[in-house]
Each structure stands twice: as structure tokens, then as C-alpha cells.
């Protein structure tokens, strides 16, 4: 049994590289000679397909796994010979070079066609996509972007407002770098969800919600062929069922939860390997500070002291996660090693008494999967110990991701407590974009604002001194914690089990890059 740990060592330096063509990790898919004929890969995805619009999506699995199969990007995630995360030049470009800290030149591959008769992929599509991203829900990933200067239909230059070393990885390799068809998108009113008006990639897709996504060959694709002609991704929401499906030989790869990871380390399934994508996840319990029951900061701080994050790591994650003290993940500048509050039930009781609160009843909402429900159940017991009665309310992924967004209904007004986990990129600026003032009612479900926080966010993007960036991000997490609206929980590893006959390609954020997955 092999364990493939993907290192992030040297990431930031590598991400600022001036040219991508010289690195062996940057090949497009695989060569035609290596392409498998008629082979099918069977994988497991979980959760509902929410949206394939790169500027208006939840992100993560299965949205990104799908998006990377059917839309152009200038770069994807790759790894160098040491395992460090680097930009990987895609089949959609002949060349991409960072000429200087604020200019990235690229040349598109000619002859790549959009489906549904929308013509050739051109720099007009790239400009439209990037300009649109800069004003979308995901615009934080494009804060450094100023404009795209078109030279001709294939050549253009990305111009940044100021130097931002990880732009290729943070902004271009993730969903924010996905390119959509200008004419097709404008034709459907400027936005779409799960039915893309035009795609351009080696695969076509068909899907049935919560059942499957099937990827089949795109007959109009003139680029290099991926290793697997067909991919079937089946939806299995229950993690134990997914592990059983793998053990029964029904699927070739699946993400596994920490308890399964712990078990497979001791007793692996036959002919299997484990791949660890990274620990770029941060989980916390959020509190809606506008809710009448939680408006008093003493109540929120009491809840901070009531929750035992170490017990959650051991009970829900088998000790395989790292206890969290903020939103910056392990290995990154700005990672905290302690918080200003501690697990202290006596302090929690004293704060509740000081606030004159008794017989408090709250609801904890969580995604309906094993480790989140276990986490919420442990929190429920912690709160019970200080006199707070909590009810755990598991949610399917669709309703869960809608509940704090004002545009999706009125549920945000009812939110009290929730267990939340976001994925990050390999730079500390990324997680903070969701908590600035303008994200209230979108992704800042705790509903607080801070002028200092907003100013520091902008400062962190343009600051190049690592020591200064470290201080900025430490202070920003302190501001978040001081609202009383956050209980930091864990940073968990993203782990997959796969057949020894399959060489899985994983993004550092934990999704599968299926177009690069091939027979081992």
C-alpha cells in the first residue's frame, strides 16, 4: 500500500515562476500514444451539482471536478518533481509566460471549438470571463486583476493592478480561472447554473441530480485525448456506503472520511493506495450575531468557551485532523498556533450568568455527513454541560449551502449555529475574501462588519513582505475571533483511496482533476 503525500514546500516561490513551458509537470493530459481506447473510469462524487457558473457557484465537489472536464483554463494545478504545487499549462494554450510581476502573456491553441455552434475559443471569451469574474461572487480571487489586453484572437496579456505572486495558482488554476463562452452566456441572460450553454473540452457531460454525472468524448475536440474515454461519476452521499462500494470493486476512487482513513492506514483494502491532497480545509462553528438569542456578545463568548475542539478532533476525526485556531491553514503564512479563548465550561457558565441568560435553546445546522453530524453532536453535549439545550439539524447539501444567502430565501433570519467547512487555496489571502463586509448576506453568514478588517484585506493582497503579511493575517483572525461569532474546530486532510491500477490526479484543494487521471 502506498501513501502519496503531496507537498506544498516551496509553493509560493514556484507559483511566481516566469514561464511554464520548461517544467515536466506541465504536459497537456497525456500523449495520443498513451490514450486508452474505450476504457471507463468509475469514481464517486458526493453532494448535489449546484452550479457550473464559475463566478456564481458553491465550488468544491462535484462542481469543480465537472468544470475542469468541460471548460477551458489557461493553467490547472500541477506538481513539480518534489511534489510542490505549481501551475500546469493546459491544452488550451500554446504558451503562457509571466513576463514581469504584473504582466502575464499567453497564446491560445487555435481550432478549439465551443459546442452548440458557438465557434472557436478566442481571447474575447477570455476577456469576457475574467472581466465578469472580477465583479462576481468570487471576485476576491480577482482582486489583483486590472484588465486583459487583446493582441489578436489568440494572443493577449493579463495586466495586474499590483504584483501578486500566487495569481496563477489562486486565480487562474481554480474555478475563477475557468473560461466561458461570451456569445453563449450572453444569449442566456448572462448567468446559468447546471446547464452550460456551451462547453469546450475533451468531454461532454450528462447528469441526473444526486445519481450520476457521465463524461463521454466530445466529437468536436481537436486537442489531446484524456486517458479514459468515458468517466462515470456516481453520487454516494453516505461515506460508509462509499467505502463499501470501493471495497466491493464498484468504483475505482473515492474520497474517504478521517475514520475510514484511520482504518485503512491499519488495514487497507487489497490492491489499493491512499493519496493525500493536502489540509487546505478550515472548519468552524458559526453564530449569527444578528439573531435575538445571540446578539449579546457574552452569550457568543460563552459558547466559544463551552466547545471542546480537541474532543471533536478525536471523536469525529479519529485524531487525523489538526486542531484549528483560525481560517489560515497549516503551512501558510498567518497560521495561528493558539486562540484567545480556551475550553472552559466554568467560564462559559459565568458569562451566561452575567448576561442573565438561562434555559437557552439553540439549533445547530450541519451538512448531513458522518463527521459533521458527529461534530455537531459533540458540540451539543458540550453546550448541554453549560446549560444550553441544542438541537442538531442535519441538512442535504442544496438547502445547506442556500441557508445563509439572502438571495435564496428567508432561512438566513432563522440561523443560530452551524458547523461550516470551507476549502482554501495555498495562499493565506484566500479565506478572508468571504468575511469582508460586502459578503454579509452572501457568504458572511455571521453577519458582522469591520472597517479595519476590510482595509487589512486590501492591504494583504498588495503586500509582498512575508513578515508583514503574517502580521496582517494574524490580526484579521483576531478580529474575527473577537466578534465572538466563531468557534475554531479543525483542519482536516483530504484523502482518497484508489485502485493501484489508477493514477489519480488531485487538486491541492481536494477535488479530482479527472482529465489528468490515467492508468497507473
What are these regions (language model features)?
Residues 17-29, 212, 217, 306-335, ...:
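Detector for C-terminal structural segments
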Residues 44-100, 198-199:
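N-terminal lobe/hinge region of extracytoplasmic solute-binding protein
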Residues 132, 218-264, 389:
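Ligand-site clamp/hinge motif
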Residues 140-185:
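Surface-exposed binding/hinge segments that line
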Amino acid at each position: 500500500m502506498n501513501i502519496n503525500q503531496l507537498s506544498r514546500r516551496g509553493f509560493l516561490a514556484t507559483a511566481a515562476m516566469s514561464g511554464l513551458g520548461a517544467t515536466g509537470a506541465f504536459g497537456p493530459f497525456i500523449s495520443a500514444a498513451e490514450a486508452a481506447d474505450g476504457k471507463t473510469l468509475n469514481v464517486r462524487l458526493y453532494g448535489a451539482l449546484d452550479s457550473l457558473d464559475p463566478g456564481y457557484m458553491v465550488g468544491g465537489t462535484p462542481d469543480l471536478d465537472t468544470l475542469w472536464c468541460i471548460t477551458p483554463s489557461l493553467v490547472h494545478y500541477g506538481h513539480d518533481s518534489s511534489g510542490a504545487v505549481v501551475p500546469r499549462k493546459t491544452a488550451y494554450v500554446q504558451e503562457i509566460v509571466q513576463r514581469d510581476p504584473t504582466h502575464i502573456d499567453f497564446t491560445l491553441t487555435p481550432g478549439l471549438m465551443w459546442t452548440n455552434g458557438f465557434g472557436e475559443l478566442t481571447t474575447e471569451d477570455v476577456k469576457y470571463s475574467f472581466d465578469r469574474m472580477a465583479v462576481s461572487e468570487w471576485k476576491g480571487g480577482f482582486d489583483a486583476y486590472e484588465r486583459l489586453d487583446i493582441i489578436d484572437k489568440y494572443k493577449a496579456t493579463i495586466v495586474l493592478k499590483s504584483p501578486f505572486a500566487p495569481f496563477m495558482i489562486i486565480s487562474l488554476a481554480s474555478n475563477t480561472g475557468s473560461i466561458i463562452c461570451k456569445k453563449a452566456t450572453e444569449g442566456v441572460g448572462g448567468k446559468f447554473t447546471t446547464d452550460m450553454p456551451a462547453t469546450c473540452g475533451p468531454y461532454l457531460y450528462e447528469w441526473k441530480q444526486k445519481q450520476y454525472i457521465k463524461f463521454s468524448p466530445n466529437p468536436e475536440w481537436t486537442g489531446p485525448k484524456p486517458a479514459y474515454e468515458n468517466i462515470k461519476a456516481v453520487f454516494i452521499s453516505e461515506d460508509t456506503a462509499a467505502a463499501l462500494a470501493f471495497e466491493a470493486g464498484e468504483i475505482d476512487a473515492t474520497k474517504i472520511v478521517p475514520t475510514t482513513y484511520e482504518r485503512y492506514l491499519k488495514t487497507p483494502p487489497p490492491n489499493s493506495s491512499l493519496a493525500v491532497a493536502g489540509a487546505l480545509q478550515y472548519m468552524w462553528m458559526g453564530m449569527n450575531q444578528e439573531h435575538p438569542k445571540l446578539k449579546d456578545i457574552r452569550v457568543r463568548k460563552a459558547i466559544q468557551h463551552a466547545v471542546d475542539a480537541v474532543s471533536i478532533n478525536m471523536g469525529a476525526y479519529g485524531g487525523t485532523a489538526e486542531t484549528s485556531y483560525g481560517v489560515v491553514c497549516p503551512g501558510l503564512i498567518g497560521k495561528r498556533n493558539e486562540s484567545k479563548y480556551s475550553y472552559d465550561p466554568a467560564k462559559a457558565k459565568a458569562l451566561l450568568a452575567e448576561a442573565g441568560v438561562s434555559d437557552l435553546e439553540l439549533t445547530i445546522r450541519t451538512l448531513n455527513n458522518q463527521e459533521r453530524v458527529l461534530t455537531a453532536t459533540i458540540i451539543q453535549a458540550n453546550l448541554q454541560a453549560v446549560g444550553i439545550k441544542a438541537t442538531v439539524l442535519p441538512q442535504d447539501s442544496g438547502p445547506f449551502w442556500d441557508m445563509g444567502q439572502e438571495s435564496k430565501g428567508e432561512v438566513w433570519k432563522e440561523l443560530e449555529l452551524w458547523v461550516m467547512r470551507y476549502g482554501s487555496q495555498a495562499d493565506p489571502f484566500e479565506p478572508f475574501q468571504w468575511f469582508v463586509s460586502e459578503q454579509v448576506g452572501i457568504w458572511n453568514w455571521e453577519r458582522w462588519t469591520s472597517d479595519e478588517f476590510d482595509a487589512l484585506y486590501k492591504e494583504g493582497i498588495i503586500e509582498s513582505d512575508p513578515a508583514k503579511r503574517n502580521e496582517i493575517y494574524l490580526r484579521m483572525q483576531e478580529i474575527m475571533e473577537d466578534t465572538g461569532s466563531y468557534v475554531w474546530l479543525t483542519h482536516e486532510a483530504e484523502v482518497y483511496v484508489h485502485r493501484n491500477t489508477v493514477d489519480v490526479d488531485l487538486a491541492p484543494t481536494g477535488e479530482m482533476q479527472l482529465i489528468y487521471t490515467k492508468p497507473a
